Amino acid sequence: MEHAYIIDGRRSYIGVENGMYKHLPAEVLAAEVLCALVPEDVRQTVDEVIVGNGVGASGNIGRLATLTAHFPQAVPAYTVDMQCGSGLEALTIAAAKIRSGQADLIVAGGVDSSSTAPRRAYNRNHPDYERYGGEESFYSVAKFAPGEHDPYAMIRGAERVALDVQMTRQELNKWVLRSHSLAKQAREAGVLEPYLVGVQGATADAGIRDRISERFLNKLPTLLPAGAILTAGNTCLMHDGAAFLMVASERYVKEHNLTPLAEIVDSVTVGGNPDKSPETAILAIQKLLAKTKHTAEDIAVFECNEA
């Protein structure tokens, strides 16, 4: 079986909803990053482009972004929707295709624009049309599980898990402070500088809070009426951004005399209780460790999507 190597990557600076990219459609944001990542003379060697997208207009924004970036029309592209895991699933598919010998070079990643996401509403033929507002039935958060369409489903799930593991708001806020501190340190050290694309003149990620204190976090109101833990300060924001990696086979790496940045060793995808969605991160880690015959102690860094 082939090896799957990451040979390069780029991402935009991350903007918050209605911030620095508020008038920039997702396909244009993605195209800017794709152009910065893949040199023109390499684009014809790309076997396919896989784009994760969670809040777009459906269709095939991956193909639209690739054409907007002036890739050769012969390069196929498609879109993956696994909501918050869309970009990662695009990468998983890319690695699987490389390892199975179906491709030698794939560009994979994701893009979302909360600022320009289309307004979605129930069709008047839908049985829940009147229940959710009729002509004013616009929603921004998709329905994730059977039953009521609850825009706060993810927040309620996170609150349930926090209560189940007896996590206090004060404990959670300490992790928030740590997260922002580490992000700030990485920014000041220029850790990601070689991989950042200054779309529309952007020079910094908008979500990193330079001035934030435990006292401030502890004073914020909770998001849920009966909630005890989650606030606007310890939950993720809505963002605009794009990120892509070039994934190549060992054959491609040798042929072009490249030095890989990393190897994608393996991956798993799991499902779990939609009412307690954050728990699935634990299930995925456990399954992957068992599959690869590793223990947690063998891994230097774990990174979990906070959404």
Regions found by a protein language model. Give the residues of each.
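Glycine- and Gly-Pro-enriched alpha-helical subdomains that act as flexible
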Residues: 250-298
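Flexible glycine-/small-residue-enriched beta->alpha junction loops
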Residues: 106-160
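Active-site-proximal alpha-helical scaffold in enzymes
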Residues: 82-112, 162-192, 245-251
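N-terminal extracellular/periplasmic Venus flytrap/periplasmic-binding protein-like
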Residues: 11, 23, 27-32, 171-255
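Beta-strand segments within the central parallel beta-sheet cores of soluble alpha/beta enzyme folds
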Residues: 43-52, 77-79, 106-111, 171-178, ...
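Conserved catalytic cysteine-centered active-site region
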Residues: 52-104, 148-153, 211-237
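Conserved active-site "lid/cap" helical segment
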Residues: 1-69, 73-76, 84, 157-169, ...
